[in-house]
Amino acid sequence: MLVGSDGGVAFSASGGSLETRSKNFHTAQYYTVAVAPFNMFKNGKTVVYGYDPEQGSWDPDASGGAGSFVYKMFTTIEGHNDVFSGGMQDNGTSIQADNDDGFSLANDFGSGDGAATMFSQNNNNRYVVYNYVYNNSVRVLNLNPGQSNDRAGRYRISNNEDDEGDFINRATLDSNLGIIYANAGNGNVRAYYNWDDFSNANSVKDNYVISGLGATATALNVAQFQNQTSTLYVGTENGYLWKVSNAENTSNQTKEIISGNDFIGSVSDIEFGKDENEIFVTFYNYGVKSIFYTSDGGQNWASKEGNLPDIPVYNILQSPLDSDEVIVGTELGVWFTNNFSSENPTWAQANAGMKDLRVTDMDMRKG
């Protein structure tokens, strides 16, 4: 399990207590973190080159004679089980890989502010989506074996300067169908598609807009329980939870509000349990109930606030081994409960080795 916060990254090798950060090289906060599936890099070799020209030198004969920087900083991924990435404040998007829960170097393959970062969950098509601010520069790094991952080989999904969405923009990935959904502001979500065959690195990819959601999207997630259609869930800044069925089909979409009556504030996270009927929703405001759960697809909602202090909650994860074990990332670090099914769960801090910092994102390795 990987936890990103104002103080950098902490990790848990067992899904339990967080390890002490003995190597404090990250000074910038991680806005987002992402973990590759366990067996994604079991076979084949992938080399990711860094972005920073100061780590390389200019070669006038590279890129077919056009000249380019030859980078010295690179990460080799070959048989690694622990591969993770994240978007950092002012420090681009990094990638790390190791096999022994030990110290590994972070390699910045982006630049500027790193934002939404998402690994493919399809082991047969390896890539990581990364973003600069707004929707100005959404890109995909092809991690399939044998690919060139220098700067020229990265795939451009969007390239504009109209500042669509938020500065650090919310997004989600349907890696079954190859669609990136990103907040586009004003009640809209932009969907980028027709790119995951990696046929043209430099062309801006096709996109369409899902409109009529009423307010800015502050949380998005795709239910990854089937691969024929795309069901998108969108939480908004005015406290609504939308379900968009057939989100991949511009002519056959259906949108419905499945919010609870007690939803007040801005939605910060949407996660799923064992199936699409189990949905977890959190809010990042003070003075409101921050954690809700449904087991019937949104027909009935229960507050799971319990004894949690009045603090913003930014993200939530359920243990895949015990449905009663749930953790949340908050303004004051990570909190956990072992009795989530109770009407009033008992929450306690789980910050061993990590300070009382804002936890901006959490991700759990699949597969």
How does the language model describe each region?
Residues 1-367:
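Beta-propeller blade termini and top-face loops
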